[in-house]
Amino acid sequence: MASAHDRAVLQAIFNPTSPIGDVPGLNQEEELMDDDSAFDPELVKQVKDLELQGVSSAESGDLPAALQHFNQAISVLPQRASAYNNRAQTKRLLGDTKGAVEDLEHAISLSNGKGRSACQALVQRGLLLRLSGHDEEARLDFERAAALGSEFARQQAVILNPYAALCNRMLSEVISKLRNPEVSEMQ
């Protein structure tokens, strides 16, 4: 079995653009969860069922039905962040970017920036900010989501960080020279 150091070296060789130390499977943390302990368990179960119905509707292409399920979930338990996050995704798919951002901000606020819903909302908001050309704000959201455990957000934060991009480019060149020393001698 390879050591953590060996896996880190292999990661740097095969994925030179990923952040140094970003080794998939190296940090085997527990999956990020939302804290639902403050809510009535029966209401949480009801809301989760509504959210699953909403996700199922969205996956089958029935976005209006998905939106209706997420609206119902929010009306049952308006203090729970997850349904706002899911509704934001549906609103985005329906072309309502402004409404999506409002729901994402609500999800981040309700979750106190912690847990799975916060992580997902930060990633989604980061993507929307990036699409609208607000790269610095997007990078900040990606960094917060990365701190919560999102590998995708970590990669996006590196891409948007000019210093990290420069370091990764230099590392890629060094690794390329190590792989093909005769090519680098001719240059």
UniProtKB/Swiss-Prot annotation:
- Asked if the keyword Repeat belongs to this entry, the reply reads yes
| One example of a Gene Ontology biological process annotation | tyrosine metabolic process
This protein's superkingdom? Eukaryota
UniProt xrefs under InterPro entries: TPR-like_helical_dom_sf (IPR011990), TPR_rpt (IPR019734), TTC36 (IPR038906)
Query: At which residues are the TPR repeats?
Result: 47-80, 82-114, 119-152
Task: Please report which protein family the annotation says this sequence is part of.
Answer: Belongs to the TTC36 family.
Q: List the Gene3D superfamilies hit by this protein, alphabetically.
A: Tetratricopeptide repeat domain
Q: Which UniProt keywords apply?
A: Repeat, TPR repeat
- Underlying gene: ttc36
User: Which Pfam families does this UniProt record tie to the protein?
Assistant: TPR_8
What is the protein name given in its UniProt record?
Tetratricopeptide repeat protein 36
